[in-house]
Structure formats: C-alpha cells, structure tokens
Amino acid sequence: MTRRWSFLVQCFTFKKKEGVRSRYMSDYNYVEVLQKSILFYEAQRSGKLPESNRLNWRGDSGLEDGKDVGHDLTGGWYDAGDHVKFGLPMAYSAAVLAWTVYEYREAYEEAELLDDMLDQIKWATDYFLKAHTGPNEFWAQVGDGNADHGWWGPAEVMPMNRPAFKIDEHCPGTEVAAQTAAALAAGSIIFKETDAPYAAKLLTHAKQLYAFADQYRGEYTDCVTNAQPFYNSWSGYIDELIWGGIWLYLATNDQTYLNKALKAVEEWPKDWDYTFTMSWDNTFFLSQILLARITKEKRFIESTERNLDYWSTGFVQNGKVERITYTPGGLAWLDQWGSLRYTANAAFLAFVYADWVSDQEKKNRYQTFAIRQTHYMLGDNPQNRSYVVGFGKNPPMHPHHRTAHGSWSNQLTTPSSHRHTLYGPLVGGPNRQDQYTDDISDYVSNEVATDYNAAFTGNGAAVWSGQSKLPNFPPKEKVEDEFFVEAAVMSNDTTSTQIKAILYNRSGWPARSSQSLSFRYYVNLSEIFAKGFTDKDIQVTAVYNEGASLSPLTVYDASSHIYFTEIDFTGVAIFPGGESLHKKEIQFRLSAPNGANIWDASNDYSFQGLTSNMQKTARIPVFDQGDLVFGTLPNK
C-alpha cells in the first residue's frame, strides 16, 4: 500500500456516527424518510421498467428516446415534475447520491436500504453509459423543455417529439461532461464492492468523459441551447472540473487527477464565495470539503468553515457578523425558488464536515444546525407540517408533478386531487416568512426534483438512529375505473332507441394509450322474435361517429334472444393526453324493421338505468384487445 493510499484510507474510512445518532434520537422515523426519499427516484424513472418496479402507477415511457439520432437513449430520470432528461442536474443528482453512499454506506446497510439505493443510482449510471456514444460524444439532453412544459399529463403517454441534444469536440459542454464523469467515478467506488466489473466499466467511461471535458472546454448551453432557459450554467465549468477531478482521484488514487482539480481551483474566482451552497450549478462547495479532508490545506478548511458558519451561527467579517437570512420559524433561507433544497444541501455539507472535523465545538455547531434544519423540513415549523410528500403530519398533497397528478385532459386542475401518492420528494418550500401554499400550479414552492432530494436523502442517512424501515412498502394503490362508458338516451319509442355514448380512457395504473378499445351494447329481442322477426331485421346505424365501426347485432344468448352490437374503435388512438384525446363519442340508433311499432327497450340489458343525462354505466362493458376491462356482462 502506498503512503498516499494509506492516507486516503485513513481519511475516508466509513465510521459509525454513534454520537450523532444517539444525540439526535427524535420522534421522527428517519429510516422512513430515507426509505421514501429513495423511492422518489423510482417514480422518476424513464424507459422500460423492470419487473421489480414497485409503483403500479408507473409504466414504460420514453421508449423512442434517441431514435431521432440513431441511438438508444432510453432510461435515466425525468428531471422534476416534467419529463425532460436534463443531463446536468441528472448527473449532479446521481453524483451526490453516490456521495451519500460513500459517506454513510453503513447507515444504508443497517437500515436495509443499500440495495434500493444502489438500484436507483444504477438506473442513472446505466443511462449515462448509453448516452456516452463515443470518447468525445455525449448526449446531454433528451426532450424539448418548451414543448414538454406546454403539456400536462403522465409520462407514459407523452405526445410530443423528444429530440436529443449532444456535445462533442466540435461543440463541447464541459459542465455536463465533467459532472457526468464525477457521477460515474463516484459510482465506480460504491459499486466496486458488489459488482467489480460494472464499477470498472463506469470508471473507464468516467476517465474518457473527464478527458473530453478538460481538453475541449466550453459552456454546454452554447451547444445545448434548449437547456439554457432551464439549466443554464451560471457558475461556468471550472467547479465541475474540480469536482470531477476529485472523484477520479478518489476512484483511481492517481495523483494526476488531484493535480488537475487543484489546478482548476486556481481558475476559480479568488474571492471564494461563502454566501451560497452546493447545487446542480455550483459544485465548488462540495469540492472544498473533500479537498479539505484530502489535502488538509488551510485554505479549504477555512473556506468550508466560513461557509458553514455563515449558514449556522454567523461568520465574523471585519468585526461584523454575516449570516444567512433566517425565517421567523428558524429556516436558513437562501432563495424562494426551491428554498428547502438549498437548506437541505447546506445541512448535508454540515453533516459531512462535522463527521470529520476534530474540534468538538465546531462538530456540535454544525451538527446542531443540520439537524434543526432537517427537522424543520420534517415538521418542526410554524406550519406544523411536513414538506416531504407522503411523510409525516399534513404533508403536501398537490406537488407540481405531471405523472403523480395523473390528468387525462392536459389540465393541472383536472382531476382536483392527485391520483397517486408521490412518496418521498422534498417540495420547494416556504418563503422567507414561513408561508407556504400546497398548490399544484406553484412550481416555485411546490415542485419536486431529483436534485432537491439528492443531499436530503443523505441527511436521512446521516441522522439514521436505528429505526426499522416500513414493512410492505410501498402499498399497492387501488386502481380506479380507467376505461368506461358514459351514456344517455337521446330518444326512445316503439320504433327505435337512440343512444349517445362516450368511451373514456382515463388510465393511470399506469397511463397507457390504446388503439383497440371497444364496447358492447346489449339488447333483448324477445319482443322482436315474438312478432316473427329476427335480429337480421334490426338496423344499427351511426348518427354521429368519431371513428368507430358498428357491428350488426351478434348473438350472445340465443335461448334468451340477447344480442349485442360492438362499437369498435380499433385503429383510433385513445389516451389520457387531452380533453379530446382521452374520449371518443358515438351516437347510434337501433331501429325496428320498416318503422314497425314493435320495439321495446325496457328489457334491454344495456338500457337499464339510462336516462337523458349522461352517466357511467357498467352495463355497457368495455374491452381492450377483446379483454373485458370495465363493466359486467349479462347473465346467460
């Protein structure tokens, strides 16, 4: 073992945080927080879902991603409450999640959540491997942010085109290449113990991506211009070069990468900021903690503590105490847009640094700050509510999230309540006065995102204190009627009956499109046969039709003279993607021969209960590819 590697092992040996766990025992079930936060990433999955998928309201989606450029770019995570796969925040989220395992692997293991966590991270790293189609080519985004944000519906039935955008040596993107290199390098470390070949593969791609990022420099939004309104890299790319270099050093023990990181530090503005924190855009605050531990250099230690002091008790500058804004309720508040994600990020940095620093007063200071802020998010706040969906007291019920909401009409007001529980995400959070409204339309305060939960997940691991995870979690959601018919009587007399029927696809477990839906209308022709006529004499005609074919009457029970007409929408795509897209109407008439006064609908199975008002009826059963999916059939 080299001296340098021995030093590295001494610095980064996994340690039980017994002091933290025993000190911060509380009424909060931290492992439940951790369990649900991890599950959130499963809800964000794009692509072909495995049999192990635990959410019955999520299905395959984005299966043609990359088809426009001739590559398989399926997989990865949807960014937030939308369905774009933005490369920069996805890579950041994966890197931070891997870092939480690096720091708190033992906590994940003891909580019996390590496998779940690794599974979520692997979903992202698998995608990065697909997106890295050449040493100097990486597909940095799939989906048009503008088109995506203009539609409100479940991921499984997205109707818009999803173009792919790349970076290469002709049009580079240092931020996303270096950030992805960091995610893959960190991934190679945490997977080495359980899957060494996979870890080696991740490391190979990490090296290539970092070399690409370093050699061909440029801001990625100059090439992936579609990302600019959503994830512009305001901090530039130097911070990602530092961050990526550190993780490659940790993964390889190659001094070259540490030297590259330290060289990039010299390109960082000399007046190192201390009034912000880590984010998808700024990875300097993460990097300086790792550099403090690796190098023990005074500049990194002082900069880290200056930042953590600013967030906690205050930093003395020129005889004046500088401190972040605190809400009346005690939240360290940086910015309105996703206020809690910044606080969660700062808390994670405090946990990590407190676990390393030897000064007991500083250790206590940073731990106290981190745990208080975490508890604020879990319920210790003036609103007396949890800010984690599906957890605690009075949690958010209306997060800004398309698939969880489950609209069928391309409207965030329909339905009035979410159809699905999106367990685990941290919502944006309150304003500087602790005020918050649980409003689906408020994407500033009530959206969720993969980057919001990354460090927050680590906080759950940092404070885990021996509780047990929830058994049989998540519960399987009860499926509502997904396909059904509403019908009304337009006219009815002794010569004919005219019915208005609307076939609906409001599927959500999961949402899905169908081009093979049909329904049947059953009649009893006893009175027709009694008059010497047969089913062949009954006319079935469409008065108004949105694409269906009507069958002649077909025998169902000859002995009872029960027949049906099948209204078949085969070839017509019906899916929960808009007001006119999720339903199809037909008006049809059943008529006695030659206008004879022998028609009597009162004994018809499907006529029972119908009025002049539209209503759902189980007596008009619905079929998909010939299989009954709604309603009941007449007894034979």
UniProtKB/Swiss-Prot annotation:
Catalyses: Endohydrolysis of (1->4)-beta-D-glucosidic linkages in cellulose, lichenin and cereal beta-D-glucans
- List of catalytic residues: D82, H400, D438, E447
UniProt KW keywords: Carbohydrate metabolism, Cellulose degradation, Glycosidase, Hydrolase, Polysaccharide degradation, Secreted, Signal
The record's Gene Ontology biological-process terms are: cellulose catabolic process
**Principal localisation:** secreted
Any GO MF annotation of the entry: cellulose binding
Q: Which Pfam families match?
A: CBM_3, Glyco_hydro_9
Localization: Secreted
Kindly give the InterPro entries that the UniProt entry links to this protein.
Answer: 6-hairpin_glycosidase_sf (IPR008928), 6hp_glycosidase-like_sf (IPR012341), CBM2/CBM3_carb-bd_dom_sf (IPR008965), CBM3 (IPR001956), CBM3_sf (IPR036966), Glyco_hydro_9 (IPR001701), Glyco_hydro_9_Asp/Glu_AS (IPR033126), Glyco_hydro_9_His_AS (IPR018221)
Could you give one GO CC term from the UniProt record? Answer: extracellular region
Q: Which SMART domains match?
A: CBM_3
Gene3D superfamilies, alphabetized? 1.50.10.10, Endoglucanase-like
Q: Which family does it belong to?
A: Belongs to the glycosyl hydrolase 9 (cellulase E) family.
Quote the protein name from its UniProt record: Endoglucanase 4
Query: What organism does this protein naturally occur in?
Result: Bacillus sp. (strain KSM-522)
